[in-house]
Amino acid sequence: MVLPAMFGAKEPHVIGFEPCHCPEAERERIERMSEENERRAREEAEKRREAYRRAGIRPRFLDAESPMAGGIMAGVREGRGAYVFGPVGTGKTHLASAVARMAVDDGMRVRVTDMPGIIARLKSTFGTQASEEDVLSGLSRCGLLVIDDLGKEPPTDWTLTQVFRVVNDRYETMRPVVVTSQYDLKALGGRLSRNGDIDIALAIVSRLSEMCAKHEMRGADRRLHGQG
């Protein structure tokens, strides 16, 4: 506040307020700052979790972390994928989800899916204005594609052809893919060709072999031991 000059003074009087520096006021300011920082941290964490959900990471794995994820992610940044295989319950999906989280945090467009998910999305276009090409393009052109549990269900010729189209497109455009499976690549070829064309199955396996570093997961079923 500025008051006119008084009592013969040549300059106006300036009356202002200074913050109180007493211990109680300082403590209140620190508490307010701490609460604000916590609020912002919660909002940022929720934004990240929503980004993970949009990428297709399942709720159980939204907080997934793994000491192996950093090495795989380093390869992803250079355009190299990963083939993670091993018995049921050894942490394959957990690891793939941890990599997907890191890719989202890197700003990559990520899509996490599985064979039934791919087929469901393709079939959802039947009788609509959407096309199979729209779905396949979304899977082929994202920065990182994660296909979980490949080979769990033996595919038909039609299903196998769609998977080949996605894998081949990513192979030709040098976009990374992370795949999990119960089978090593040799066994995967036999599994995929059980109800489908063996040549297409082997073509998928060949491309994955070149595109991906192999990571074998070993050990007992973590779910049965309460570690899932």
What is the role of each PLM region?
Residues 93-107:
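P-loop NTPase Walker A phosphate-binding motif
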Residues 1-70, 226-228:
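A short, basic N-terminal segment
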Residues 108-109, 141-144, 171-179:
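Loop/turn-to-beta-strand initiation segments
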Residues 57, 68-81, 85:
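P-loop NTPase catalytic core of nucleic-acid-dependent motor ATPases
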Residues 79-97:
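Walker A/P-loop nucleotide-binding motif
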Residues 73, 104-141, 154-157, 161:
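Short glycine-rich substrate-engagement loop in P-loop NTPases that contacts/grips substrate
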